[in-house]
Amino acid sequence: MAAPGEALTSSGYIAHHLSNLSLYKLGLVGSETSFWNVHIDSLFFSWFTGLIFLGIFYKVAKRTTAGVPGKLQCAVEMIVEFVADNVKDTFHGRNPLIAPLALTIFCWVFLMNVMDLVPIDFLPYPAEHWLGIPYLKVVPSADVNITMAMALGVFALMIYYSIKVKGLGGFAKELALHPFNHPLMIPFNLLIEVVSLLAKPLSLGMRLFGNMFAGEVVFILCAAMLPWYLQWMGSLPWAIFHILVITIQAFVFMMLTIVYLSMAHEDSDH
């Protein structure tokens, strides 16, 4: 931020809005790269959107009726059926937890992405001037720590179900003897399979982060480069297009999760 009485430049405005409220910024850890440098705003808004998801679905579940459903119940039922159909078409194992997991991921990621449509200064301005909070980023999925944490969670489930379904020996055999089933090719197979395995969570998390971070940067540029009375001319068309991006990214994250877990449930001899 600029010093008191000093005008904030466009570059300063952009840098400020791309900065997280972290323990380092509050002087609670000594380094910005410290493992303990938690991004408080990203955690808060990820929890906030998660609670919204739980609240909506809990409310609908309690008020579900066999009669004429309300608009909210219809919307929730459409989402549930949409996710269930995709799981049925994509997941070929037997696991009753996959559909609820896919539903949670789709709705949670979608709600985190939707925060990108909140006007740039709508929450940061009152937070800074009324509450004394110097930095506030409201889009959790534009924080690589959040997206990679979710991707690593999916990765942990992949490893867990691979070992559970195939056995530790079967999982090791899959890494060592595929794609070339010959002892001399084991080092080459391991190199290919381990890189492929590690690339899954990396691409899963970075894809979501990259798309949402880029969208956030465009909104910030519109706010920084245009006078307030013209900002809508840049932000509105991008917001309309971004609605599609928000939905697609949530869908892609969900579908890749289903695909990866389906692969983990496949028999090693498949």
Swiss-Prot record:
Where's it found, cell-wise? Cell inner membrane
MF term (GO), any: proton-transporting ATP synthase activity, rotational mechanism
Residues annotated as transmembrane: 38-58, 98-118, 143-163, 208-228, 239-259
Tell me where it mainly resides.
membrane
> Pfam families annotated for this entry?
ATP-synt_A
Task: State the InterPro entries in the record.
Answer: ATP_syn_F0_a_bact/chloroplast (IPR045082), ATP_synth_F0_asu (IPR000568), ATP_synth_F0_asu_AS (IPR023011), F0_ATP_A_sf (IPR035908)
Q: Which domain of life is it from?
A: Bacteria
User: What is the recorded membrane topology of this protein?
Assistant: Multi-pass membrane protein
Q: Which SUPFAM superfamilies match?
A: F1F0 ATP synthase subunit A
Subunit structure, interactors included: F-type ATPases have 2 components, CF(1) - the catalytic core - and CF(0) - the membrane proton channel. CF(1) has five subunits: alpha(3), beta(3), gamma(1), delta(1), epsilon(1). CF(0) has three main subunits: a(1), b(2) and c(9-12). The alpha and beta chains form an alternating ring which encloses part of the gamma chain. CF(1) is attached to CF(0) by a central stalk formed by the gamma and epsilon chains, while a peripheral stalk is formed by the delta and b chains.
Q: What is this protein called?
A: ATP synthase subunit a
Gene field: atpB
